[in-house]
UniProtKB/Swiss-Prot annotation:
Gene Ontology biological process: protoporphyrinogen IX biosynthetic process from glutamate
Role according to the record: Catalyzes the decarboxylation of four acetate groups of uroporphyrinogen-III to yield coproporphyrinogen-III.
Protein name as catalogued: Uroporphyrinogen decarboxylase
Keywords: Cytoplasm, Decarboxylase, Lyase, Porphyrin biosynthesis
Single GO cellular component term: cytosol
Assembly and interaction partners: Homodimer.
PANTHER family the UniProt entry points to: METHYLTETRAHYDROFOLATE:HOMOCYSTEINE METHYLTRANSFERASE RELATED, UROPORPHYRINOGEN DECARBOXYLASE
An MF annotation (GO) of this entry: uroporphyrinogen decarboxylase activity
Similarity remark: Belongs to the uroporphyrinogen decarboxylase family.
Length: 354
């Protein structure tokens, strides 16, 4: 495989010196780009796009053709694992993902098959290897998965939720059922991410989108301990390089010390925590990723540049910062504003790396 031409992102995750702060965007391959919308229309629907390695590669590379990004992220979905477990994933227009056969009992959990990622999720591995080849060493490729808790919320709720009533009922009325599900999911995530590494992923991210709906005690019990298990089970060196892992819990700012203690390389931050506060609290244990509010991309170019400058100033000098949004870029953002954001990070950060 080609030698990396731009390893800023991996160096920042290792808290090594860089010339400028690296930047990428969650959901950088997405509906805000007209070329993405055209490719998705060609695929027919979202999961067909995910399952076609050439088209998944195409949409992964699209933002890199537009912007000087420092990393590519696999185009896929966090729900590939429960889909492969036979829950019948489908998408309803305007309502997001749903499952035909949600999990509601211990017997449902016991029936969940053990996955072989190279077989049951072979289309993801094909996409990873295709993207890695087509990147030609320009930037590193990030692989990812949802966290066990976040995957379980969709599997038990049967789709997206605002109140999480079903999974919280299971957590408190049948905790042993939920723990069995979370344990199975943790094992599946470990196998899935390790397969992505072998297919070509050079860094990993675990998205705990819904960890923030839990109380501190319940977060430790139902989310964090399973992410800790994942970190312990991952391949940490491959092809002569460390494979860093970033954990991202949305609304998880109150728990960053505990997240840092898992042994992860970096913590993803949303916009509800000040990055200077996060840096003070975790010290040099981990790198930090984030954390501009994605809604800021609706601001004027001047306002976007001002926010980038403020966050860089808040982080200050020192290594270990990957600039990102605090969550995914939204479909209604002007692509020009995304370019303003990315260019501002490189322009304003150089003075912090002299």
């Amino acid at each position: 495989m080609s030698e990396l031409k731009n390893d800023r992102y991996l160096r920042a995750l290792a808290k090594q010196p860089v010339d400028v702060t690296p930047v990428w965007m969650m959901r950088q391959a997405g509906r805000y780009l007209p070329e993405y919308r055209a490719t998705r229309a060609q695929a027919g629907d979202f999961m067909s796009l995910c399952r076609n390695a050439e088209l998944a590669c195409e949409v992964t590379l699209q933002p890199l053709r537009r912007y000087p990004l420092d990393a590519a992220i696999l185009f896929s979905d966090i729900l590939t694992i429960p889909d492969a477990m036979g829950l019948g994933l489908y998408f309803e227009t305007g309502e997001g993902p749903k499952f035909e056969r949600p999990i509601s009992s211990l017997s449902d959990v016991k029936k969940i098959p053990k996955l072989d990622p190279n077989d049951d999720l072979g289309y993801v591995m094909n996409a990873v290897s295709t993207i890695r080849r087509e990147l030609k060493g320009e930037v590193p490729l990030i692989g990812f998965s949802g966290s066990p808790w976040t995957l379980a919320t969709y599997m038990v709720e049967g789709g997206s939720s605002k109140v999480f009533g079903k999974i919280k009922k299971m957590a408190f009325a049948e905790p042993q059922t939920l723990h069995l599900l979370l344990d199975k999911l943790a094992d599946s995530v470990i196998d899935y991410l390790n397969a992505q590494i072998k297919a070509g992923a050079q860094s990993l991210m675990v998205f705990d989108s819904w960890g923030g709906v839990l109380s501190p005690r319940d977060y430790n019990e139902f989310s964090l301990q399973y992410m800790h298990k994942i970190v312990d089970g991952l391949i940490r060196e491959y092809d002569g390089r460390r494979v860093p892992v970033t954990l991202f819990t949305k609304n998880g700012g109150q728990w960053i010390e505990a997240i840092a203690a898992t042994g992860c390389d970096a913590i993803g931050l949303d916009w509800t925590i000040n990055i200077s506060d996060a840096k003070r609290r975790v010290g040099d244990k981990v790198a930090l990723q984030g954390n501009m509010d994605p809604s800021m991309l609706h601001g004027t170019p001047e306002r976007i540049r001002q926010e980038v400058a403020t966050i860089l100033e808040d982080f200050g000098t020192g290594n270990g910062h990957v600039f990102n949004l605090g969550h995914g870029i939204t479909p209604d953002v002007d692509p020009e504003n995304a370019g303003v954001f990315i260019n501002a990070v490189h322009e304003f950060s150089a003075k912090y790396h002299k």
